[in-house]
């Protein structure tokens, strides 16, 4: 079964919430390390907006009739990282529900970040 999730985040909404408050709520430890390295405030906002949109889209894609492990539903247990070519990928070390593959695309403008996620839930092993 394949599911799709999409989310759009307005960057000025993050300004209202507060960058550091949102970072503490949604970023994994790996993402937080990347966030702290970013010096430009606008780049920090864009980074947060992309991660927030990605995780919202991911959770929307998880809304299936099957039971999802509660550890899969915590923002901080998921990392949206980038490979050597800059392409985003999804990482989770705590989720016991197995999804493969998880495909993700993130785009942004000066005002918005949008993420699209496609997940395929594999059947659980009967052994």
Curated annotation (Swiss-Prot):
Residues that bind Mg(2+): 7, 56
Localization: Cytoplasm
Keyword Lipid metabolism: yes
A biological process from GO: fatty acid biosynthetic process
Alphabetized InterPro entries for the sequence: 4-PPantetheinyl_Trfase_dom (IPR008278), 4-PPantetheinyl_Trfase_dom_sf (IPR037143), ACPS (IPR002582), Ppantetheine-prot_Trfase_dom (IPR004568)
Catalytic activity, reaction form: apo-[ACP] + CoA = holo-[ACP] + adenosine 3',5'-bisphosphate + H(+)
Primary localization: cytoplasm
Residues passing through the membrane, by range: none
Keyword list, A-Z: Cytoplasm, Fatty acid biosynthesis, Fatty acid metabolism, Lipid biosynthesis, Lipid metabolism, Magnesium, Metal-binding, Transferase
Record's function text: Transfers the 4'-phosphopantetheine moiety from coenzyme A to a Ser of acyl-carrier-protein.
Protein name, per record: Holo-[acyl-carrier-protein] synthase
Name of the encoding gene: acpS
């Amino acid at each position: 079964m394949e599911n799709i999730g999409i989310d759009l985040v307005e960057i000025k909404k993050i300004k209202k919430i507060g960058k550091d408050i949102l970072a503490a709520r949604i970023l994994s430890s790996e993402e937080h390390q990347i966030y702290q390295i970013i010096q430009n405030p606008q780049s920090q906002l864009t980074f947060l907006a992309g991660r927030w949109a990605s995780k919202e889209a991911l959770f929307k894609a998880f809304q299936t009739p099957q039971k999802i492990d509660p550890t899969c539903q915590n923002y901080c247990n998921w990392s949206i990282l980038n490979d050597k070519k800059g392409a985003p990928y999804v990482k989770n070390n705590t989720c016991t529900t197995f999804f493969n593959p998880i495909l993700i695309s993130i785009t942004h403008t000066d005002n918005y970040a949008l993420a699209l996620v496609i997940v395929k839930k594999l059947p659980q092993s009967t052994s």
